Every structure is written in C-alpha cells, then in structure tokens.
Amino acid sequence: MNIDVEFHIRHNYPWNKLPANVRQSLGNSQREYEKQVVLYSIRNQLRYRNNLVKHVKKDERRYYEELLKYSRDHLMLYPYHLSDIMVKGLRITPFSYYTGIMEDIMNSEKSYDSLPNFTAADCLRLLGIGRNQYIDLMNQCRSSKKFFRRKTARDLLPIKPVEIAIEAWWVVQAGYITEDDIKICTLPEKCAVDKIIDSGPQLSGSLDYNVVHSLYNKGFIYLDVPISDDSCIAVPPLEGFVMNRVQGDYFETLLYKIFVSIDEHTNVAELANVLEIDLSLVKNAVSMYCRLGFAHKKGQVINLDQLHSSWKNVPSVNRLKSTLDPQKMLLSWDGGESRSPVQEASSATDTDTNSQEDPADTASVSSLSLSTGHTKRIAFLFDSTLTAFLMMGNLSPNLKSHAVTMFEVGKLSDESLDSFLIELEKVQSTGEGEAQRYFDHALTLRNTILFLRHNKDLVAQTAQPDQPNYGFPLDLLRCESLLGLDPATCSRVLNKNYTLLVSMAPLTNEIRPVSSCTPQHIGPAIPEVSSVWFKLYIYHVTGQGPPSLLLSKGTRLRKLPDIFQSYDRLLITSWGHDPGVVPTSNVLTMLNDALTHSAVLIQGHGLHGIGETVHVPFPFDETELQGEFTRVNMGVHKALQILRNRVDLQHLCGYVTMLNASSQLADRKLSDASDERGEPDLASGSDVNGSTESFEMVIEEATIDSATKQTSGATTEADWVPLELCFGIPLFSSELNRKVCRKIAAHGLCRKESLQNLLHSSRKLSLQVLNFVHSFQEGASILDIHTEPSFSSLLSQSSCADMGVPLPAKNLIFKDGVLSEWSGRSPSSLLIANLHLQ
C-alpha cells in the first residue's frame, strides 16, 4: 500500500479531503480508496468506532468478523485491545482463538516454526503447547489416521487454558455470561460475577485468587492489563520466549521497536513522544509485554492493604513487595493515591492520552535514586554474531536466556548485567575447536563489560565536583534492532539515554553500523568506514596494501588476473558479507558465481599458504612509536605513520591488521572453523547472496606466543602491509581486548576533551571517505581526494548512502601502491554482450 495513502487513512481523511496526488495514485477511484481503508483497518486491527472504516463499512459485526479471520489466517496475536468486542460481542476468547490457530496449522501439517515468535509465546502461555508438545500432538494426529477411529486435531487440543500467571493489578472484566453459565458456577464464583457486573471492573487482587482463575478458565471473564501514561516498565532477561520467525505485521514490528527503546526510567507517555508513535499503540504493546511475562511494572501498582487474603502467598505479589522498597524505587508515587485502583488501572485503550507528566516533576525517593534514574549511560553496540556465539556454545545453563534477550529485545540493560556477569563467570574453557572460540568471546565480553561499566577512571574529568563519581551505567544494544527504528527516532532514543556509544570490533559486513554525531561514537563514524571502500581508502592514502581487485557486479573473469598468479591463498570479500580465505587453485568458478550476485573484492593473502597477520592496537603509546621495526614493535611502520597523519587514531580505539603474505610460519593448522572479520584468515565464508557455493575457510593458529614471534625468523618492514583498520573494542582476542581497554583508559578517550576532538575528526574522516567513494561512482569526475569537500556535499552523499553503501560502478585495482581503474585483459560481461550483438 502507498505510504501516502496509509498516512491519510491513519489520520481519517475522507475521500473528498484527499490531496490530488493521492487521489491520482488511487486511479481517482473512491471505491479503491474505500477498499484500501477496510484493508488497512483490518491489517492494523483498528477499532470500528472513531476510525474512518466506520464511514466505509456499515456492518460493524461483519467488520470485526473479517478482522478476526484475517488475524487468525495470518497467525497474528489475539487483539487484546479489542477484548470487549471479541469476548462480549463475538464470544471469541484468547483461548478459543489460539485453539483455532493451532487446529489450522495442524490440519495443514505445518511445522511449529510457522508460528510467529509472539504468537507462539502466547500459545505456550495459554495452551501449554511448545515445540516438543506440538511435535507430540502431530505424531498422535498422524498415527491416529492409520486406525479406524481417527482423532481430529481438535480432539487432541486442550479443552481449557492451562494455569496462567495473573497479576494482582490486572483488571477483571465480565465476558459474555448467560443464565446457563451462572448455573454451573459455585457460590463464590457467583458472588464474584455479581460484584463485577454490579460494581464494574475489579482489580484481580481484590477478588479470591482461585475464583479469578476458575472464572477465567471457564471463559466467563477476560483480563485487561492496564497501562497508564506514567507507568514505567522493566524488561528482565526473557523467559518463555519462543524463537521461531518474524512475520512483520504492524503489531509485531511495533513490539520490536519498543523493546529496544524502552527503559525503566522512561514512562510510557514519554516513550511514545520519543518514538513519535501514537500513545494508545505504545500502551497496547507494553500491555502485551506484561501479559506475556516479558516485562513488569515498576513502582506501586496496587495497595497491599486491598489484596484479598488468598493472594498473600502468590509469587508475583511477593515480587511486588520487593519492588516497593523505597531504596529500589526510581520514580515517586505522587498523584496516584487520589485515584481508585481501577481508575489508575483503566483499560489500556481508553486511558487519557493527555496526562503526560513533565519528567522534571517526577521526583525520586532519594538523592541516590535521582542520580541513578537520570544518569545517561554508555551503550556498547554489538551485532548478532555475538549473540549467536553465546547461544550456540552451551557455555552456561542460564546464559541462553540473556543471549535470547540480547537478540530478541535488542538490549540488555544495566539492571540485568549483574546476573549476566555471574553467568559469564561460570563459563568454562573447553580448550579446543569452535567451542574455544565461543569461550573466548564470552570471556572478552565479560572483561569489556567490567571495564566500561561504572569505571570512574573513564570519566574522571567529567564528573561533577559535588557528586560522587561512580562512572556510567552500561547498556548492551544490538545494532540490527536499532536499525529497525527510522534514523530520526534512533537518534532521539540514543540522545535521550546515552552519553557515549562504543562499538564492538569488527562489526559484521552484513549490517549497517549505527552512525551518530551525538552521542559521540567510538566506532565506525559512517557505514562506509566499515565497508570494503575503507580498505581501499587506507591503501590509497598510505600507498601500501596487498594486491587488491574490486570487481563490480556482473563482471566475468576468464582467468585469474596476473597479480594473483603467484599467490597460494586469496582473501575474498563478497559485498555485504564477511571475507574468507580460499585456495587460488579452485577460486575462479566461485568468483564468477559470486559476481553474478554482488560486487567482490579479491586480495592476495599468502604466497606459501595463509599469510601471517598481526593486530596492532591503537591509540599508540609514545614508546610504541620509537625504536626499530620488529614483529612486536609495528607502530614505527611507515604505513602506520602515514595513517596516523591522515586518520585520527589518537581519539579512537581499535586495531590495524598487518599482513605478511610471504611468511612461512611452520605452526599453521587447517580447520573448518572460522573467526569474524577481525582476523581475515579466520573469517567466515558465508554464502554469497544466495549462491549455493560458499568460500572455503582455512585458518591459522589464532595466537602466536610473543617469544615465538621474535624467534621465528627475521622480518623486515617491507614484508608487512596494512590489511584492514577496525574501530571499536575487539572481542575475538583476549590479549588484544586487554590492550585496547588499557589504551582507552590511559589515553582518556572517554573524557570530554577527547570526545570533542573525536567529533571533529570523525566528521573530517567521513567527508574524506565519502568523497573518495564518490570519485569512483559512474559519471563522477575524479575528485582530488586531498581537498576538503563541503558539509553540504556530505549530507547529499549521506542521503544516498542511507539506501546502503554505494556499490562500485567501475572495476578498481590496487597494485604497486597505486589505486586505479582496471579494464582487465578479458572484456567485462557488458563488453561481451556488445560483441555478441555485433
């Protein structure tokens, strides 16, 4: 559906008020517009009243029936915000809705993975059917077909909900109750029903605990999970989340957007304002988190004196009591005492959206809480590679729930880091193979968290004189989740909550790094700095680097170019993927296959097997810039000296990978394992944009003892060239990680003056790299790389780059210290096509 059309439907524009261009896009057909109105309303589960669909579709009941059918067919979450209509009007409870969905997928013999993540989680909560139970049910269903008395899927499904968790602050509403229903109720149940019908909705905590569950199981009541404007929500590590698939419907997209944006110190109204999303939608999403048990309300949600005696020993109430400790509270309860509990806990869809409070008016309980509640944090940015390592390694029994939270929520907040660190501490080294790689990442992640979190040495000069300096809290943020927000929203979220961003290094090529001027970012300034282009930029400015050939998509090679003929191993990077080292002997077929899907960078890596790589951390200490060149004193290398003059390495951290292609180290080993882009010889050879062939992965021993390095033969400066420069804190090597963290503290990178210098140098580098990339685009004149372009040109180029890092329009070769256009001995695919036409 057209974005403009969606906008006008969302804002209830009738046909006669539509702009001419929108009418034209609909073929000037009012009937077409009305059809789009109904479709949009059903897809977004809009309420009939107060929306445009009311004026288009006259039959309200028919509309809700179609909405329910669409939701069920597309395996969407039950529309809890429409519970009053669904339960009272259509008599469809969440239990009957999910029973129908489960019956449909069983009859279609679909796998459990066909259920979207949140739908699967709600099915597990209400029906008690998870992956293993579903497989068991399908086996029973299939086996029954072989016998005379065949059981249908409906026969095998539960007839009533499993025991669900109900919080004391949830609101009990009367469902569709007939006289016959009342006859099968016990006396306490009848009294409860009478109270709800006569006095209106009741807090579940004010009724008998067992009666509430009994009435819910019978389908006589439904539950509202009320969220008010000033509610604050905490998201602990996920339990009971089902990782199946992402569907992409409106509500699921909203749930993921809010997941990564929410924090314990921002109330719902403020969050809606930051995200620029309708307040009622945000409340619906937060209500769903609480219903599924993925989040809980902070602060006083019910007066404990109002609790029915049957709730005293309920675990959720005991947890509630612990949250009422004033020292643990971050927000005051002022203003809530004058309202009745049910008014405070009014329906999530009907809460007044104009009751947003000024954050400045929200006083905290103590000065310590004030400091904690309003202190901006450091954000450590990671990608999905890290969560995969933590999930796949079976490193610690309870580590997986944290890893799932990091992946699905997209954030692990400072409040959860204590338990996360305890789990990381339990990780035991296996000492071999791929599992050792997972262990190394877990260990270095723990060290990095301990270094960045509440480290008073990092911010010694920025602390206020009248406040104790505890350093900054730390949140872990997944880049892919942040990129799910539009750039403006992402910027608002980051600016509101964080004082500094620090990236892991390297970030995978398969994502666009987060770009940020404020808060400052110790990491790639723009996506181009984390791409193939930056490699070529480094080679261009230093005049040094391995022989490299960047081929545009569609190019076809008849033979391997001459510059690679003497190499035994090549480093191959297909566009948007991480690199892999492959033998020269069988590379041509794979290259041509990859070139049909994407641009490819080919680089010489080793003349006698795999080349040797050494990672040189920066910023450089004074002692590292003195003395003679050796394997352990690479800071004096001429290329690094030039690089320090052209790129600000003193206010950023990271490492430069140096390559010795002629090295003949004896202690190499072959393995089918691989490391990430930080060590190209350990790089993953992921398939090339759908190609069935993937690059073979060959690895050398990741760590070479320093003494061994020094005695393994003489080396000269000429043997070594820069291969790659990565900004951020590396996680793939414990030794490198320790060195970089030490340098961050020693050079004061997180202090105010350094960050100010970083802002200027990052902008300058961004301008230079974008200008460099632009000079090799089709139709662009070759610009002087050494000139300083205007800031407006940066903006214009960045806007184009928002669609992705620009692809090469020309084939480029780096040879003998010079980067130039490559015509090649064999004609490109375009030229071949022209030859056939002649």
From Swiss-Prot:
Write down the superkingdom of origin: Eukaryota
Q: Does the keyword Phosphoprotein apply?
A: yes
**InterPro entries found in the cross-reference section:** FAM91, FAM91_C_dom, FAM91_N_dom
Give a yes or no for keyword Phosphoprotein in this entry. Answer: yes
* One of the record's GO cellular component terms: trans-Golgi network
| Residue ranges of the region described as Disordered | 334-367, 670-690
Q: Name one GO biological process term.
A: vesicle tethering to Golgi
Sequence ranges of Basic and acidic residues compositional bias? 670-680
- Where do Polar residues bias regions lie? 340-367
Alphabetically sorted, this entry's keywords are: Cytoplasmic vesicle, Golgi apparatus, Phosphoprotein
Subcellular localization(s) per the UniProt record: Golgi apparatus, trans-Golgi network; Cytoplasmic vesicle
Provide an example Pfam family for this protein: FAM91_N
Where are the Phosphoserine modifications? 332, 340, 671, 828
Q: Mostly located where?
A: Golgi
The UniProt subunit note reads as follows: Component of the complex WDR11 composed of C17orf75, FAM91A1 and WDR11; FAM91A1 and WDR11 are required for proper location of the complex. Interacts with golgins GOLGA1 and GOLGA4 and with TBC1D23; interaction with golgins may be mediated by TBC1D23 and interaction with TBC1D23 recruits TBC1D23 to AP-1-derived vesicles.
Q: Which family does it belong to?
A: Belongs to the FAM91 family.
Role this protein plays? As component of the WDR11 complex acts together with TBC1D23 to facilitate the golgin-mediated capture of vesicles generated using AP-1.
| Official protein name in the record | Protein FAM91A1
Question: What organism does the UniProt record list as the source?
Answer: Homo sapiens
